[in-house]
């Protein structure tokens, strides 16, 4: 998302704006409305056979930045494209796993128990995926009580964790590459004019 880290990247680029003819910064994965549709399609087409008929919960990082709203927008886009029961919960954002569990139990598609798939909505599956999401479950042990899997289990569900970052899906990588192609084309066009040195953003 276009959150804290991405804005730090842009600020860092500004410091060197005068040292190069041009600096180009491509868009984050979710920067424009079309990105949500593209990522929804890329993710669901990559996951649908694995998910089957079971509910899917994607674990995002979350942020105190206003871009935290991107997770709710991404969930809406996924549901609209997949026509499936999909949720996004975050580790450090406003949408918690408790919020999702409450929705699962009280919504129109309410499920009181049963299998639920947990998959990271992060580029790589690292510490958050292994600990905050799976809580040691991938090692054949009972999940930690404060992990996503542990809280789902305590609520009566049967969580199944997939330790795989979204960067492992070729269709998602293609969205990143499309952003790179866009900014490269923009950079080339800008360099053929008489523009002064500066920074180009996707």
Would you name each region that the model predicts?
Residues 1-202:
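Extended amphipathic ligand-handling, pore-lining, and cofactor/metal-binding catalytic surfaces
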């Amino acid at each position: 998302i276009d959150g804290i880290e991405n804005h730090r990247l842009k600020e860092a680029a500004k410091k060197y704006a005068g040292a190069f003819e041009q600096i180009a910064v491509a868009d984050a994965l979710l920067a424009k409305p079309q990105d949500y549709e593209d990522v929804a399609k890329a993710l669901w087409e990559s996951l649908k056979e694995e998910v089957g008929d079971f509910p899917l919960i994607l674990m995002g990082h979350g942020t105190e930045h206003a871009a935290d709203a991107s997770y709710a927008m991404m969930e809406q886009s996924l549901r609209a494209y997949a026509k499936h029961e999909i949720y996004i919960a975050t580790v450090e954002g406003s949408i918690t796993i408790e919020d999702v569990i409450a929705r699962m139990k009280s919504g129109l598609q309410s499920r009181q128990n049963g299998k639920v798939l947990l998959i990271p909505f992060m580029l790589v599956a690292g510490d958050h995926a292994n600990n905050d999401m799976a809580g040691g479950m991938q090692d054949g042990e009972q999940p930690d009580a404060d992990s996503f899997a542990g809280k789902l289990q305590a609520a009566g569900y049967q969580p199944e964790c997939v330790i795989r970052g979204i960067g492992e899906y070729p269709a998602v990588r293609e969205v990143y590459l499309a952003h790179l192609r866009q900014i490269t084309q923009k950079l080339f066009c800008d360099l053929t004019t008489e523009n002064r040195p500066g920074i180009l953003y996707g």
